[in-house]
Amino acid sequence: MRYRKGARDTAFLVLYRWDLRGENPGELFKEVVEEKNIKNKDAYEYAKKLVDTAVRHIEEIDSIIEKHLKGWSIDRLGYVERNALRLGVAELIFLKSKEPGRVFIDIVDLVKKYADEKAGKFVNGVLSAIYKAYITSSKEEKPSLKSE
């Protein structure tokens, strides 16, 4: 599953451009795939799945993120941080990734690549809190997802 790191990068760029430019995510996906010259079918399909999931659940994803920002609104986040968190929540919570450690590493690496180390630590902290609340909390009472 080595292709997934590249797929995450592709999906991140699509979400980033969608947030920044407000254009059709499907068209942006085609644009990024062409720019990156993606030939690997698995990478293409996984990136598409990530983008489709994030776009389909964007309101819920933003609500989940907002609950864990502690005094911040999602609109105050930079484009890199906001869209890295969206991608992470889509994959960890909605797609229920079987490799959460790898997702965390790749998401934080994306933030460091496109922003900086401090932003990477911030995203890691917020994503960890979300993951703990939705996945690793005891089975007593987890926050619910409307789409389930």
UniProtKB/Swiss-Prot annotation:
Keywords: RNA-binding, Transcription, Transcription antitermination, Transcription regulation. One of its GO terms (cellular component) is cytosol. One of its GO terms (biological process) is transcription antitermination. Coiled coil: none annotated. GO terms for molecular function: RNA binding. The keyword Glycosyltransferase does not apply. It comes from the Bacteria. HAMAP family: NusB. Belongs to the NusB family. Involved in transcription antitermination. Required for transcription of ribosomal RNA (rRNA) genes. Binds specifically to the boxA antiterminator sequence of the ribosomal RNA (rrn) operons. This is Transcription antitermination protein NusB. It comes from Aquifex aeolicus (strain VF5).
